[in-house]
Amino acid sequence: MESFIIEGGRRLKGTITPQGAKNEALEVISATLLTADPVRIQNIPDILDVNNLIKLLAEMGVTVTRHGQGDYTFQAAALNLAYLDSVEFVRKCSSLRGSVLMIGPLLGRFHRATIAKPGGDKIGRRRLDTHFLGFKSLGAVFVKDPQRDTYQLRAEQLKGCYMLLDEASVTGTANVIMAAVKAQGTTTIYHAACEPYIP
């Protein structure tokens, strides 16, 4: 087993600026798909998963402007929804766990989403059931295409409801919230995750 050995005896001094949190960044960046207006986000961490999500959004038609280190503006005014059905999109989503967070905003705003089975790190079970059960409660229907390993979700009009999540999933809660903000009526979520960066 590896370990850290820390030798003290020296007074610590100085200041640091912490990097933004990856999970929060993935959620907030995905939430920019909910509007056609420009959204500026600062303190975005410069890490692979986040950078890959930013590139993926740009390829979908989101206008991405980098103002400086960790400082971006996103404008999802002219999305190419047909790109979601492309082989390239499916391949890229399959290697990026954070891509699942685009489902809620796309379903809420455009009433449809096609997303690959996401990849990324493998901590615990990492199920998608919570996401899909939440979307289903809002009125979405989904079909898995086993040949392409994609999920297609459709909803003419999402409707607010009371729902009990089967687990307090952080990404599941965030995804359902992002879909619910575009739903008709009020949504109340029980057994929601309560991390401080839930949108």
Locate the predicted segments by residue:
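Structural preference for solvent-exposed beta-strand-turn elements
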Residues: 1-199
